[in-house]
Amino acid sequence: MDLDSADDLGLNGKVAIVSGGGALDDGIGNGRAAALLLARSGARVLVVDRKLEAAEGTVALIKADGGAASAFAADVTDENDCRNMVDAAMTRFGRLDFLDNNVGIGSRGSVVDEPLETYRRVMQVNVESMFLTSKYAIPAMIESGDGGAIVNISSISALRPRGLTTYSVSKGAVITLSEAMAVDHGPDGIRVNCVAPGPVYTPMVYAHGMSDTARGNRRDASLLGIEGMGWDIGNAVRYLLSNHARYITGQTLVVDGGATLRGPERDSR
């Protein structure tokens, strides 16, 4: 395989499912960015969101950019919806090569004050959904005959928790799930990796409002002193799904501007 060309991502003509691919209004979240970038590289994209209008907004952007995409409404915590989602990709596009799992919710409690029902819901949305989407996507990838690749979105909270116990546990489970899937399905030619975003500025983050001070604090958490965006995560996803990552599986790509390395100042005692 000749990978000398920087443009040869191996995505042209392939089919990707991007769950959580919608966004508020014209905002660019992680999933929407990934869907747009995959389409720009020639992939056909099934954009999945619980709210059909959010998925349709992403599809409209892709088509305006000259790409091919279709919208699908699904609750990825529902097994039947996950089955139907994969069936839709196979029916509309004839094959399936990639899955990008973006769906997730947050929580702020400790083990003492987090209600058990909240813990269970976070684990269902953040972990079980990826189990279910993969359960049906992997056989379709095998049927399509060229292997495939999956990217699951974790978080730096899995690597260096700052409290947020339930959320951190769920995102750690995403990494372990991905590693186990990589072992199980490597022989099928299917690669499975994670992206662990840092404090990126996306519609999910600012939906309920964010002060300039809070936004600045998030930016300053980066060693680079810059703000992460949905595009940064989308580019990482596209790379891991592409031929450029053909020898990478079971890994977690941290995209945080160095935030996980942040500690005491160098001259502290």
Where are these regions (language model features)?
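Short C-terminal tail/terminal secondary-structure segment
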Residues: 2-7, 238, 249-269
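C-terminal helical subdomain
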Residues: 7, 176, 194, 213-248, ...
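Canonical Rossmann dinucleotide-binding motif of NAD(H)/NADP(H)-dependent dehydrogenases/reductases
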Residues: 10-46
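Substrate-binding pocket helix/loop in short-chain dehydrogenase/reductase
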Residues: 110-111, 115-120, 218
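Residue(s) in the substrate-gating loop at a strand-loop-helix junction
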Residues: 155
